[in-house]
Amino acid sequence: MDSLTDQVFYMNRYPTVGMVITSEGVVAIDGPMKPSDAIEWRDFIASKGPLRYHINTEHHQDHIASNWYLGGGTIISSEVTYSDFLTSLPSVEVAKERMLFYDPECGPLLDGYEIRWPDITFRRRMTLRLGGQTFHLIFSPGHTRGQTVVHAVEARVVFTADNITPGNYPFFHSAAVWEWFESLALLESLDVDWYVPGHGGPCRKDEIPRQRQRMFDVIGEVKKLKDLGLGREEVQERVNYIDRPGLEHPRVLGDRAYLLQKNGVGIVYDALGEHPSGQAG
């Protein structure tokens, strides 16, 4: 485990997860996908205090599979994340199969495993006050259409989930493409010292322009091919950015990373036919 302050801790696994200690218990943001990591994270949380709230920032399996392992604590997500839960974990069987792939020695840890859903949902914004700490949960579509960022005000840190991924290529397979840029602008406006991303280590505000540029690079490549008259499937086959030098992608995903990239290129292709302000009406 690593710390940013005496009250803020994070674990840079898959994904990067975080927690804030208050005088009345712990607020955790996401949890590790591997069962062995999730149990390690659970035990660390317990060493700091009771888990009071557990926030799911998105519906992707790497962020929600640990809900069952962490136990206790009220789980909170956006309404959209709640509605998309089964698109990532369609069944307990699929969840177990993927966890065994990512964590081959975890078999005994899967006994009794269940998909644990959020207990409370919110639409645009929610504020938690616990033990002298204030947490603003802000609906911030981007990497997924239901994304949440968590602004821990007094701790001067924001947990961005996959809206920021330092050193990693962006994935668009569940993205709200144009809203993602709006969410980055919101993150830039916050008065914080640290940004804890969904993948990679904590960063400063100067990471946000780099994230924005990485997204522009992918979108620009797709646009160039689309403008040449190439169809959606052809563009999906031709755009392969995650193997290029300079940045990383999650190797733990194996070949699935290429499927996610392909699906994301399709999402970008479709978004280029939309007006960023949305549909008229």
Protein language model features and the residues they cover:
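Metallo-beta-lactamase
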Residues: V26-V27, M33-P35, T127, T134-V218, ...
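Short glycine/proline-enriched coil/turn segments at helix->beta-strand junctions
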Residues: S23-E24, S47-P50, L70-T74, E154-A155, ...
